[in-house]
């Protein structure tokens, strides 16, 4: 039997999630929750488009839907945090300078 990979636990960012969820549609909530579960179980890079934040080591954006991203931070001891949830256009630290 193969060793089971340890899941990451959400350690910070619940207030961000709750604030965003108060105005989000059920479809958007389901998509974000799916992405967060993928971060937790380590499959996010296989299931979603991921954009590394080159300015902040250990943080990346998960593209959830058109114009909806979740920014997460990866921390020691198998934990992660939610940094931002919202539109791609308003996301912090994301510079998509496409010519």
Positions of predicted regions on the chain:
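Arg/Lys-rich, positively charged N-terminal/basic patches that mediate binding to nucleic acids
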Residues: 1-37
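Enriched for short, Lys/Arg-rich terminal
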Residues: 2-7, 64-99
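Generic structural motif
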Residues: 10, 52-53, 70
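A broadly tuned preference for mixed-charge, low-complexity surface segments
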Residues: 12, 24, 61-67
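Amphipathic alpha-helical interaction segments
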Residues: 28-29, 41, 68, 92
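A short, surface-exposed loop/turn module that caps and links secondary-structure elements
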Residues: 37-63
């Amino acid at each position: 039997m193969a060793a089971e990979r340890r899941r990451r636990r959400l350690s910070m960012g619940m207030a961000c999630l709750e604030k965003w969820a108060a105005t989000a549609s059920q479809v958007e909530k389901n998509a974000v929750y799916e992405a967060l579960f993928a971060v937790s179980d380590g499959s996010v890079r296989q299931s979603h488009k991921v954009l590394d934040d080159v300015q902040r080591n250990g943080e990346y954006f998960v593209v959830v839907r058109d114009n909806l991203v979740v920014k997460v931070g990866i921390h020691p001891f198998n934990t992660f945090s939610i940094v931002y949830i919202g539109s791609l256009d308003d996301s912090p630290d994301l510079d998509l300078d496409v010519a």
